[in-house]
Amino acid sequence: MELYLYNTLTRRKEKFEPLNPPYVGMYTCGPTVYNYAHIGNLRTYIFEDILKRVLLYNGYIVKHVMNITDVGHLTSDADEGEDKIEREAKKERRTAWEIAEFYTEAFKRDIKKLNILEPDIWCKATDHIKDFIDLILILEKKGYTYKTSDGIYFDTSKVPDYGKLAGQDLENLLPGARVEYNPEKKNPTDFALWKFSPKDVKRQMEWDSPWGIGFPGWHIECSAMSTKYLGQPFDIHCGGIDHIPIHHTNEIAQSEAAYDKPMAKYWLHGEFLVMGEKRMGKSEGNFITLSDLEEKGYHPLSYRYFCLTAHYRSPLRFTWTALESAQRALFRLYENMKRYPQENASYDKKYEEEFHKAINDDLDMPKALAITWELVKDDQVPPEVKRATLLQFDKVLGLSLNNPPEIKIEIPEEIWKLVEERELARKNKDWEKADKIREEIRNKGYIIEDTPQGPRVKKATPLTK
């Protein structure tokens, strides 16, 4: 079955034809490890995981590379400001190396909780300084660089189609809102390949180079590491839509200038997670982490399910109500799976074909989820066949349907004492006291349900409080 993907570079949905079938080289921009990933970041990684799973589902052999930006990402997202990791190190009174290691491991824990398949290759920027210098030397030899007082810059005026990814030409490209003005630049869009360490300042992360002591620019990192592990051109480059106007535009410019060939054949970008009227982001001060969701009683896979309810190229509005609905739907799926007999059976070919068509149509996960529920509700399909078909779907959905997680929530001792006190009041038919205790339990963040088997306590969500 043919697979179609929307290519940002050509602005159209295209039939996927890898450069060297059945092998696929895929590079995804990883985290800048100065803080916890927020759930907006994680939406992008879930989209990329779905893409990878769809490729595998279609029989491709995927080599997936993801970088870890542990140096060089400045607060402006381009060439000015403080290194985000060094800034955080000062704030937390730890070394930059400790900060990077701590948040790298936190990120890996998050993606494991979300059932995101790990890349085949993790590549840390600090392990590839020589590769960055070698690429800058190639660009220097070909006449694409110039020196300023604070670093070595790439001259974007020498690239006729600079800005093609964003659909703008050089004259119409203004420096992005998060790019600070540098009067020494030849063009506002020029970007740093190598930044010099400030005079009389000893940075924690700095290296010697042919141009002086300093550190790499953010954009050169992805160009050098993707080429090292995947060659050039490679098949697929992914990221968030915020990467299009600056980061990915600059990657293309320097990579294609260096090697005189396209960087990647297909460029895919995930839309923002929106909260209120703004996109979720650390710079906006409105971000939520996966741990925040867990503390409120949501399972990480409920967030994964929530992300599947919208197409990756559509903004997704985050609300607690929507997340609560996603969790309920996921738990219903788990309950159905537990009821189905674990017998050997073949999957339903009609439903599998519909599901396959949906995922191969530019990763149409909302439609794939709708087909999933049609199957669950179809009384004509035997339960053991439903189970086999859902397990087939889960190769892409990634919801752990074969092994539904046990939802365990620790209830504090003080809550259990209140439950016992309430049970005693109910036994004595002191309904007023029982109601007051129920309200007290609710105010402490838990709700109590009376069942024939006795009281059941669970953590309240923002919806049930």
Curated annotation (Swiss-Prot):
* CDD domains (UniProt xref): CysRS_core (cd00672)
| Record keywords | Aminoacyl-tRNA synthetase, ATP-binding, Cytoplasm, Ligase, Metal-binding, Nucleotide-binding, Protein biosynthesis, Zinc
Q: Which HAMAP family match?
A: Cys_tRNA_synth
Task: State the family named in the UniProt similarity comment for this chain.
Answer: Belongs to the class-I aminoacyl-tRNA synthetase family.
'KMSKS' region, short sequence motif: residues: 279-283
Output the InterPro entries linked to this UniProt entry.
Cys-tRNA-ligase, Cys-tRNA/MSH_ligase, CysS_C, Rossmann-like_a/b/a_fold, tRNA-synt_1_cat_dom, tRNAsynth_Ia_anticodon-bd
Q: Which PANTHER family does the UniProt entry name for this protein? A: CYSTEINE--TRNA LIGASE, CYTOPLASMIC, CYSTEINYL-TRNA SYNTHETASE
Cellular component terms per the entry's GO annotation: cytoplasm; cytosol
Its cofactor is: Zn(2+)
Protein's name in the database:
Cysteine--tRNA ligase
State how it assembles. Monomer.
Give the reactions, separated by semicolons, that this protein catalyses: tRNA(Cys) + L-cysteine + ATP = L-cysteinyl-tRNA(Cys) + AMP + diphosphate
What EC number(s) are associated with this protein in UniProt?
6.1.1.16
**Cofactor binding notes:** Binds 1 zinc ion per subunit.
Q: Where is Zn(2+) bound in this sequence?
A: 29, 222, 247, 251
- Organism, as annotated: Dictyoglomus turgidum (strain DSM 6724 / Z-1310)
Query: One MF term from GO for this chain?
Result: zinc ion binding
Source species, domain of life: Bacteria
User: At which positions is motif 'HIGH' region?
Assistant: 31-41
Q: Where in the cell is it found?
A: Cytoplasm
Indicate whether Protein biosynthesis appears among the record's keywords: yes
Give the chief site where it resides: cytoplasm
User: In its UniProt record, which GO terms are filed under biological process?
Assistant: cysteinyl-tRNA aminoacylation
UniProt binding sites for ATP: 282
